[in-house]
Structures are given as C-alpha cells and as structure tokens.
C-alpha cells in the first residue's frame, strides 16, 4: 500500500511553515508523497473574507514547485459549499483504494478533532498525524501519530496582518509567493 500525506488548508497565503510541516512529516513517516489540499470554504472559516481560489491555487503551485514529492489535490476545490474532510476522504479512498492516507494537522486542529464532522467514520479512513504548534498540546481522545518538528511560529493570518500593516514577510514564505502577492496587490488594507 502506498503511503501519502495530506495537508489541508486555506493556504491564504501558503508559507514556509506549511512546507516545513509537509517536509518533516514526509521524512519522519517515510511517505511517498504529500498532497496539499486547498479547501473551498472550510467550515470553521465560513463568513471570513478569503482570497480567490485562483490566487490561492497559483500561490500554492509556486510554493511547492521545487519539491517533486509535493503536489496539489483539487478534490475540495471541485465542490461547492463547505469542505468537510470526511466527504473528501470518502471520495479519495474510493478513488485511490491502494493508498493509506495520513492526514496532517497542527496542534490547534488536534484539540478540535472531537468537533469534526463524522469524526468516528473519518478515523476509519485516515491516520491522523498531529504536529506540535506553539501554544497547543497534542491531547486528544483519539489515536493519532505525533511528529515533532522544529518550531516555526508563522501563520497565514499573521502574514495577512503583516502585509496589511506594511511589515516585511521576508523568510516567512517562499520568495516567489511574496512576489506574486505584491504583483497582484493581495492583502492590501
């Protein structure tokens, strides 16, 4: 069976923390690939102003282009409405029956797992991989794989805030993504 990691998110914008997490889990678990799964409308972010799918997808393609074992999974972008991980993983496990999926989540989402839609059924479809994030523990009633990674405290919301207040984002996200953001006037106040 093939082992593939999935890291879901809004990627608004994608940053070096996303890449670090994907790379560390890839090596720690001996995965064949890591798929980045951009979501249409994450249930926990409904009502928030999110950058267009086209721009988020372009930035993500730019961010991962140098790693052969990184790719983008468009499953959630092909659907309208809220993106529930359970629905996506039902589709992916039917489409790829020879794959053992490892769903990578940060410490913030580990604590939130009991509230995930159809969590009991989802646990039968994927192995959750929890990575530590500053300010969060990896405590959950569920069986998850824990992977320690170097601490890198950056988030997409921090980057959006820094762009809006005209602070530098150098070394926090890939340089080519930074160029794309600036050329397209994203995150300006």
Swiss-Prot record:
Top-level EC class: transferase
Statement: the UniProt record of this protein carries the keyword ATP-binding: yes
Keywords: ATP-binding, NAD, Nucleotide-binding, Nucleotidyltransferase, Pyridine nucleotide biosynthesis, Transferase
Gene3D superfamilies xrefs: HUPs
This enzyme's EC code(s): 2.7.7.18
Any one biological process term the GO annotation gives: NAD biosynthetic process
SUPFAM superfamilies linked to this entry: Nucleotidylyl transferase (SSF52374)
Keyword Isomerase belongs to the record: no
CDD domains: NMNAT
Pfam family, one: CTP_transf_like
Molecular function via GO: ATP binding; nicotinate-nucleotide adenylyltransferase activity
Pathway noted in the entry: Cofactor biosynthesis; NAD(+) biosynthesis; deamido-NAD(+) from nicotinate D-ribonucleotide: step 1/1
Catalyzed reactions: nicotinate beta-D-ribonucleotide + ATP + H(+) = deamido-NAD(+) + diphosphate
Task of the protein: Catalyzes the reversible adenylation of nicotinate mononucleotide (NaMN) to nicotinic acid adenine dinucleotide (NaAD).
Family per record: Belongs to the NadD family.
Protein name (record): Probable nicotinate-nucleotide adenylyltransferase
């Amino acid at each position: 069976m093939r082992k593939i990691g999935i890291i879901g998110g809004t990627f608004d914008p994608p940053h070096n923390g996303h890449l670090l997490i994907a790379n560390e889990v890839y090596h720690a678990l001996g995965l064949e690939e890591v798929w980045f799964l951009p979501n249409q409308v994450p249930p926990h972010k409904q009502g928030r102003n999110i950058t267009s799918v086209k721009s988020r997808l372009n930035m993500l393609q730019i961010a991962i282009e140098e790693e052969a074992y990184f790719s983008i999974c468009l499953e959630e972008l092909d659907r309208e409405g809220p993106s529930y991980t359970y629905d996506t993983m039902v589709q992916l496990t039917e489409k790829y029956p020879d794959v053992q999926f490892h769903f990578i989540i940060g410490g913030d989402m580990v604590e939130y797992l009991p509230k995930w839609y159809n969590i009991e059924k989802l646990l039968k479809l994927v192995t959750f991989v929890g990575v530590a994030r500053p300010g969060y523990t990896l405590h959950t009633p569920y069986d998850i794989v824990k992977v320690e990674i170097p601490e890198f405290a950056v988030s997409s919301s921090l980057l959006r805030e820094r762009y809006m207040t005209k602070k530098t984002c150098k070394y926090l996200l890939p340089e080519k993504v930074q160029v794309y953001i600036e050329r397209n006037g994203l995150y300006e106040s």
